[in-house]
From Swiss-Prot:
GO terms of molecular function: cysteine-S-conjugate beta-lyase activity; pyridoxal phosphate binding
Gene Ontology biological process terms in this record: 'de novo' L-methionine biosynthetic process; transsulfuration
Organism encoding this protein: Mimosa pudica
Purpose: Catalyzes the degradation of cystathionine.
Identification of the protein by name: Cystathionine beta-lyase, chloroplastic
Catalytic activity: L,L-cystathionine + H2O = L-homocysteine + pyruvate + NH4(+); an S-substituted L-cysteine + H2O = a thiol + pyruvate + NH4(+)
Protein family (similarity comment): Belongs to the trans-sulfuration enzymes family.
PROSITE patterns xrefs: CYS_MET_METAB_PP (PS00868)
Subcellular location: Plastid, Chloroplast
Keyword Plastid in record: yes
Transit peptide: 1-51
Key words of the record: Amino-acid biosynthesis, Chloroplast, Lyase, Methionine biosynthesis, Plastid, Pyridoxal phosphate, Transit peptide
Length: 457
């Protein structure tokens, strides 16, 4: 398996001119980089990944710990919003409170034979580096990489594998991921096996000598099924297999799959990280130096890195992510409870409800049930009426926005899946998916009630 770090490094900013005891800091393991014009001192004993001038990954960065205070109190961990609001822009000489946008394609070099820290934005950009470092910290990862979309991020992961390799993938996942797995990845000679990842026996029986990756969602999209990330990771690692978890529905606020044993976590940053339906972006966060090097190579070689302005938009959205997620989740719980007792609703899929079969497992690996739920009415006509009759829910694909959204997956986000396949997986046409926003929850409930009550019998 890929190597994992056992220490977390620190950096410290010093007024070097005020130090009178010569090698005091050097004796503690700190050094000032040669030719550095800043006052930054770097710990030489920690594990770090970053891109050097020749675009290789080297062992000199911090993604997990940013101060001696954090390291000296290992049991204390600041809250997510505290981390986000106090994350420093190390590259900015003016210490702007809002991370600057380096909206440039290329960077001037000091000479014809010596390169500076950045040369071309495809290979690296200070604004993207700031976002990637922050996301790595939130996901407890060694490195994070930002791409132009969630699908671009997943496509990059798929390029880790070659002809003859096998991927075990969940059968209840986002429609775009399903299309990638069923219609694109097999073109490279990679074999994709589809299983119900909430059934551990089915997962175990799918492993073979060529298996290289298990790809899953928990909760799944759109039926909100729960998979045991930790046990699947144990099974996979015993066979030398990687585990990827699409964590888009949960976000870093509610679940950290890398802490549960996953090797790769993916987020569609379009969703809760951006949070306002104004950005399309994807994130891959990984554990281990080897995997980080491979992902950076692919991001750079393919040219799929997120543009500076889009990175800046994500940095703005992420500041309120925890506040939004908490508000949206609280409202979603109330809406799910309302729908569960509504006479015109046959079934509600939401892990926050007592009757959900994966509820206990979910809360053992996540902090909450999130704000995405789905329900069945038993009637395509009624479901269509509900979706088209609400006032405060916009009919659209996607989720995780401050605006409440509603959709019929079989005709929208999952329409690319053949009808026979959808039916075999239990994905019926009357399924309605809701993404709860930040509107007044009583207004949202009343809106759903009138839409359900006024529908055809």
């Amino acid at each position: 398996m890929f190597s994992r770090p056992f220490v977390t490094p620190v950096t410290i900013d010093l007024q070097v001119k005020s130090i009178t005891a010569g090698n005091m800091w050097e004796g503690l393991g700190f050094y000032k980089p040669a030719n550095s014009k800043s006052n930054q001192m770097i710990c030489s004993k920690g594990f770090r990944l970053n891109c050097s001038i020749d675009r290789e990954m080297i062992v000199i960065t911090k993604a997990l710990v940013d101060s001696i205070a954090e390291r000296s109190s290992e049991t204390y961990e600041p809250g997510l919003s505290t981390v986000v609001m106090n994350f420093e822009n190390e590259f900015d000489p003016y210490e702007a409170v809002s991370t600057p946008i380096y909206q440039t394609a290329t960077f001037k070099q000091p000479s014809a034979t010596v390169n500076g820290p950045y040369d071309y934005t495809r290979s690296g950009n200070p604004t993207r580096d700031a976002l990637e470092r922050l996301l790595a910290k939130l996901d407890k990862a060694d490195r994070a990489f930002c791409f132009g979309s969630g699908m671009a991020a997943l496509s990059a992961v798929s390029q880790l594998f070659e002809n003859g390799d096998e991927i075990i993938a969940g059968d209840d996942i986002y429609g775009g991921s399903d299309r990638l797995l069923s219609s694109v990845i097999p073109r490279t000679g990679v074999v994709v096996k589809r299983v119900n990842t909430s059934d551990l026996e089915e997962v175990a029986s799918a492993f073979g000598p060529a298996t290289k990756l298990v790809w899953l969602e928990s909760p799944t999209n759109p039926r909100l099924q729960i998979s045991d990330i930790g046990k699947i990771a144990e099974m996979a690692h015993a066979r030398g297999v990687l585990v990827l978890v699409d964590n888009s529905i949960m976000s870093p606020v509610l679940c950290q799959p890398l802490e549960l044993g996953a090797d790769i976590v993916m987020h569609s940053a379009t969703k809760f990280i951006g949070g306002h339906s104004y950005i399309m972006a994807g994130v891959i966060a990984v554990k281990g130096e080897r995997l980080a090097k491979e992902m950076y190579f692919l991001q750079n070689a393919v040219g799929s890195g997120l543009a500076p302005f889009d990175c800046w938009l994500c940095l703005q959205g992420i500041k309120t992510m925890e506040l939004r997620v908490e508000k949206q989740q609280k409202s979603a719980q109330k809406i799910a409870e309302f729908l569960a007792f509504h006479p015109r609703v046959k079934k509600v899929n939401y892990a926050g409800l007592p009757g959900h079969p994966g509820r206990d497992l979910h809360y053992s690996q996540a902090k909450g049930a999130g704000s995405v739920l789905s329900f069945l009415t038993g009637s395509l006509a009624l479901s269509k009426h509900v979706v088209e009759s609400t006032k405060y829910f916009s009919i659209t694909v996607s989720f995780g926005s401050v605006k409440s959204l509603i959709s019929m997956p079989c005709f929208m986000s999952h329409a690319s899946i053949p009808v026979a396949v959808r039916e075999a997986r239990g994905l019926t046409e009357d399924l309605v998916r809701i993404s709860v926003g930040i509107e007044n929850v009583d207004d949202l409930i009343a809106d759903l009630d009138q839409a359900l009550s006024s529908g055809p019998l």
